Structure formats: C-alpha cells, structure tokens
A protein has these predicted regions:
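N-terminal, polar/charged subdomain of small-to-medium soluble alpha/beta proteins
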Residues: 1-101
Length: 101
C-alpha cells in the first residue's frame, strides 16, 4: 500500500506528517485490499485547512472524502472517519454478496 501526502499553499512539519501517516495507515488494517492512499492538504486559508483523502482499492474501487475545519488534525480525523465508514459499508456489501451466492 502506497501512501502519499501532498500539501498546497504551505508546508507541514515532519511531526504533523508522521501523525497523519499513522492515522491513515489504520485504513489498511480495516480493509486489506487497499492499493493507494493519497491525502492532500490545502493550506490556502490557514484558519480553515481543507483535507482531501482519496483511496484506491483492488478492482478499480475508489473512495473519497473531503473535510474543512479550523483545526488541521481535527480535519484529518474527520476525513479518516468518513473513509472508515465508506470502507466498512463496502466491505459489508461484499460479505453479504458472497453469503447470498
């Protein structure tokens, strides 16, 4: 699983990047078929950063979430939570499909 973090209109500290990477890696434990994770932080408005998270899984399944908050780590937490919900729903859908077959 490849994780990419990019920043627009600013930079992140090494500590912030490490914390974000640790939070995003948890998605891989939730759903093992993830191939690529891309997180983009837009710091154009420093008081309200925008966090955009895009996840690609096997068989061309893509998931995405965006959140704007007045706190960077709060926005990261929210966007990861949104993706966790999407992945749980998708995983449940797959499991139910295989049970009915």
């Amino acid at each position: 699983m490849q994780i990419r973090i990019s920043v627009r209109h600013g930079t992140l500290s090494e500590e912030a990047q490490a914390r974000i990477t640790a939070k995003v890696e948890k998605l891989g434990r939730l759903f093992e078929r993830l191939v690529d994770i891309e997180l983009m932080v837009d710091l154009e408005r420093r008081d309200e950063p925008i966090v955009d998270l895009r996840v690609s899984a096997e068989h061309k399944h893509d998931f995405a979430a965006t959140h704007r908050s007045n706190d960077l780590m709060g926005a990261v937490d929210q966007v990861v939570h949104k993706l966790e919900q999407q992945l749980r729903r998708y995983k449940q859908k797959i499991q139910e499909h295989h049970r009915s077959a």
